[in-house]
Regions:
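N-terminal cationic and glycine-rich segments that engage phosphates or anionic surfaces
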Residues: 1-101, 105-438
Length: 438
């Protein structure tokens, strides 16, 4: 692999793309340190330390700590991620958007433009909501019109700029720009998480016990990463045979292919959906200045917080995990139904003279695909749940408050593998052996 890296840097085009990507990521991290004029940067740092829930910790992990620091990139690329998911969902409900999706490159350009507009709109709404919800509570010490406008414009412009950076990386760099920016944000929190793990499990122990704890933590991380790699790479290939037919005086067709169905078809989307919905009540309560009492509402909010699940002192809060698990399985089926349509696949196969050996074309093929799909979706959802549960157990049972969870690992591994594949394809074009063949 290291030899391949050296070979990659020998190719001017690939080397330029890697350097371009690196420079853009440096800009992202530098921008994360630029403060917004007119805000109290210590407000969220103090506020986070007093919160019992982890709703905003989930959000802050995706921003690389920019939200807690209240930099100009506080909203980061989360509005873009949200708008992309919204547009994907609307393609089913709105026929015009569905036509654009199927209209090749021209249609994709139109959808991209719509996603940009929705991103800016969401960023503006989130900025206004943040100013209204936290401004008078101390985030903006001097609530003048100029300060309010400055904060709203800074947050919106920062999110729009990061969207532009992501698109430039996709166009001129390596990998998917938005995904790489998200990965770097998550990785930027790793040093603080390592410090937390050290102070929680290793520092208070003797040398022998501390070493054992370090080995166990490392083993858990390695096992989790391996599970994610297996989950991302696992596929079920459905064999497809095409009937022979006469074209003029020649017999054509008869070739065979396959339909690769990924076990984790929905990717990390079910986890993001489930985590976002579980966090929503706590976020609303925070904007309203509520949720820190001892009433039934506060207990419900604590039950929805991941850091309270598997708590040895309050096992009843683990009911929140049951709801979380059900939501992940539900969204795995829901999102896969959007991205893969067995009816459409079966119909296209029938039109092209294709069939699955042993299965009749048409409705039987559709039923067979649905049966296989339902099975592998369930396996993929359980795999996602296992990966996400491991860090949650550490947080709840041992009180290790870390942001580097299963969602983060899934995103990082997925982005790394996808970027390596892209570099691999460029290397193969130039007759070099690539990463994935070693």
């Amino acid at each position: 692999m290291f030899q391949t890296l050296r070979n990659a840097f020998k190719v001017k085009d690939i080397r330029s793309k890697i350097f371009y990507t690196f420079l853009m990521l440096v800009v992202v991290r530098l921008g994360s340190q630029l403060p917004i004029p007119g805000v109290d940067r210590s407000y969220f740092a103090n506020w986070f330390s007093q919160q019992v829930g982890d709703a905003f910790n989930f959000f802050d992990a995706f921003t690389g700590g920019s939200f807690e620091e209240m930099s100009i990139f506080a909203l980061n690329i989360t509005p873009y991620i949200t708008s992309s998911i919204i547009i994907d969902l609307l393609t089913i409900a709105i026929p015009k958007l569905e036509e654009m999706q199927k209209d090749g490159e021209e249609g994709r350009k139109k959808l991209t433009a719509i996603t940009r507009y929705v991103t800016v709109g969401l960023a503006l709404l989130e900025s206004i909501a943040m100013v209204i919800g936290f401004g008078r509570q101390g985030l903006i010490p001097d609530m003048t019109a100029m300060n309010v406008i400055t904060v709203v414009v800074s947050l919106t412009a920062g999110s729009a700029f990061l969207m532009w950076v992501g698109e430039r990386i996709t166009e001129k760099g390596v990998g998917n720009g938005i995904s790489i920016v998200l990965m770097i944000n998550i990785l930027s929190r790793v040093p603080s998480d390592i410090t937390t793990l050290y102070e929680t499990f290793i520092k208070p122990q003797t040398v022998a016990k501390g070493a054992l704890a370090a080995v166990i933590i490392l083993a858990v991380i390695v096992v989790t990463v391996v599970l994610v790699i297996l989950l991302n790479g696992a596929t079920r290939n459905i064999p497809v045979q095409y009937a022979k037919k006469m074209q003029g005086r020649k017999m054509v067709g008869g070739q065979s292919s396959s339909i690769p169905l990924k076990v984790n078809t929905a990717g990390v989307i079910p986890v993001i959906f489930a985590s976002s919905l579980m966090s929503m009540p706590s976020i609303i309560a925070a904007f309203m200045g509520r949720g820190n009492g001892n009433g039934i509402g506060s207990k419900i909010l604590k039950g929805l917080s991941q850091q309270n699940w598997f708590s040895l002192s309050n096992p009843v809060y683990t009911l929140g995990f049951v709801l979380y698990a059900v939501m992940i399985v539900f969204f795995a089926y829901f999102y896969t139904s959007i991205t893969f349509n067995p009816i459409e696949v079966a119909d296209n196969m029938k039109k092209q003279g294709g069939f699955i050996p042993g299965i009749r074309p048409g409705k039987p093929t559709q039923d067979y695909l649905e049966k296989i799909l339902n099975y592998i979706i369930f396996i993929g959802a359980i795999g996602l749940l296992i990966v996400c549960t491991i860090p949650i157990v550490f947080n709840g049972a041992f009180g290790a408050s870390v942001s580097f969870g299963g969602t983060s690992i899934i995103i990082i591994v997925g982005v790394v593998l996808e970027t390596l594949k892209q570099i691999e394809s460029q290397m193969l074009v130039r007759n070099y052996r690539g990463f994935l063949s070693e």
